[in-house]
């Protein structure tokens, strides 16, 4: 498969990008990767070693993301079992598998690397922006959570947008911890946090991504299903002199 590749060195300056061709040697579905990581299935040594390295890296990336102030809003996925006639026989909710989280963190890393380069070179693209929350909305969130006996973080009486961003992130941490410990409000309480935030959107100017605590963010990893990703591919390749296609300023 033809791809655009970014081998990223953590904490090592501007990333490298180049055109590449990959060969898929293993059919690593999410389910199989999860089974290998859990020790339920064996795979060639190089596959297991690569997966475990990626797992350690994604865990560290996730830790750093939350440490810098990213929101922690996690919702269990809905799963269904069907009977022979196609009807729903059973339904249940389960936490996101480690294999999903692993890929998610690496995708976030790639998206940030591309957006950081484009923003650093002042290149217009379609950035995925998420502006700081409105202080009044965050104050209302804290009041609602308190009414529901959910622990809330301290907040200044008059919050600036920067204060609101920090308090919202701390509230998301407390909500996640409360839900994990009490099993109460697994869907409703994270939804309250999300409703207090600005909606993420696309913009040709880089305005940062508050929810991810990213100074620059874009969608880059799914160009076959999202047009904004394709726009960012074109902008990146044009900026690096790897494309003959004309990209308007």
Regions found by a protein language model. Give the residues of each.
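Electropositive polyanion-binding surfaces
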Residues: 1-249
């Amino acid at each position: 498969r033809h791809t655009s590749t970014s081998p990223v060195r953590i904490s090592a300056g501007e990333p490298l990008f180049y055109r590449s061709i990959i060969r898929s040697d293993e059919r690593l579905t999410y389910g199989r990767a999860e089974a290998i990581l859990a020790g339920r299935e064996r795979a060639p040594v190089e596959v297991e070693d690569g997966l475990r390295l990626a797992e350690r890296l994604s865990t560290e990336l996730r830790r750093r993301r939350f440490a810098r102030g990213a929101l922690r809003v996690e919702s269990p996925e809905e799963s269904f079992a069907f009977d022979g006639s196609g009807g729903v026989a059973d339904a249940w909710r389960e936490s996101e598998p480690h294999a999903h989280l692993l890929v998610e963190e690496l995708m976030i890393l790639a998206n940030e690397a591309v957006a950081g380069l484009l923003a650093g070179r002042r290149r217009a693209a379609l950035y995925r922006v998420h502006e700081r929350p409105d202080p009044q909305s965050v104050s209302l969130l804290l009041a609602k959570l308190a009414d529901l006996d959910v622990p809330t973080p301290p907040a200044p009486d008059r919050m600036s947008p920067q204060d609101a961003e920090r308090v919202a992130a701390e509230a998301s941490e407390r909500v996640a911890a409360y839900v994990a410990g009490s099993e109460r409000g697994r869907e409703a309480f994270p939804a309250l946090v999300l409703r207090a935030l600005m909606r993420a959107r696309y913009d040709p100017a880089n305005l940062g991504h508050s929810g991810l605590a990213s100074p620059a963010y874009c969608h880059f990893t799914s160009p076959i299903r999202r047009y904004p990703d394709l726009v960012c591919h074109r902008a990146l390749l044009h900026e690096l002199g790897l494309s003959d296609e004309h990209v308007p300023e």
